[in-house]
Amino acid sequence: MVGSAIVRRLRSVGYDNLLLRSSNELDLSRQGEVEQFFSKERPEYVFLAAAKVGGIMANSRYPADFMYDNMMIEMNVIHAAYHNGVKKLLFLGSSCIYPRLASQPMAEAALLTGSLEETNEAYALAKISGLKYCEYLNRQCGTDYISVMPTNLYGPNDNYHPEHSHVLPALIRRFHEAKEANLPTVEIWGTGTPMREFLYVDDLADACIFLMQNYTGNETVNVGTGKEVSIRELAILVKDIVGYRGDIKYDRSKPDGTPRKLLDVGKLTALGWQYKTDLIDGIRLAYEDFLSHSIRAER
């Protein structure tokens, strides 16, 4: 999702000398393949957006997979970038790197000041390792590698898998299927009280290109909207946009995850960047994308 959004944005502003490989063409978890790609193609700038991602269910069930796969991807790409003279690299992390009970909104300085959320600890530790590797290379070797921490993302080419998706795409799929099947209720994990922030993925792509052009430094930069919504409020928004007429039921026996996740985006704002897509418009665009994927899958 993120990689395709960055490509769309780069092309829209006139870049056409892009080196692109799908996961089928290049397995980033295999060091030899990654090194061969970098030594042959010699890219000058790298956006490292590849990752194994998932929601609470997937992270809870497969923590070893999430840690191993993400560590391998990050270390292989960053290491190959250094050894092959990449001029600048942007590493995309996640807001889950911050402590579970960090002061809100979460500033970049909150990193490693407390315990992580248990349900996605493995993924968070992998992401922290990636940003720290960039930091250490900058300090030791004089590289220009920057780390960007986006909030929760959604938009075109999202993952709508019933077990492995994040909350917003999962809600889109669940309400759509309930509408199509005329089901009386839709069940949602937890209490609905956790607060979350959401950023449309094309806005993140715009921010990444802005930072690649305008920021150099060893400090992490948060990317978000600075606005939050409860899971309960989000569910109602998605329900209305999808057009589902039934009821919402909350399964309080299931985990909520982190109670609140709002990023402090003051550093990015001071650099001169602002998001453009509000949540309602973004969910409408995401639902249109979901429908187009569903139609293609049926053909």
Where does each model-flagged region fall?
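NAD(P)H-binding glycine-rich loop region in Rossmannoid oxidoreductase-like domains
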Residues: 31-71, 83
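Active-site Tyr-X1-5-Lys
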Residues: 76, 118-151, 170-181
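Flexible, glycine-rich beta-alpha linker
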Residues: 27, 97-99, 122, 146-170, ...
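Conserved Rossmann-fold NAD(P)-dependent oxidoreductase catalytic core, especially the SDR/UDP-sugar
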Residues: 75-120, 146
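Short-chain dehydrogenase/reductase
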Residues: 67, 71, 119-131, 161-169, ...
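C-terminal substrate-binding subdomain of Rossmann-fold SDR/epimerase-dehydratase oxidoreductases
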Residues: 5-13, 177-299
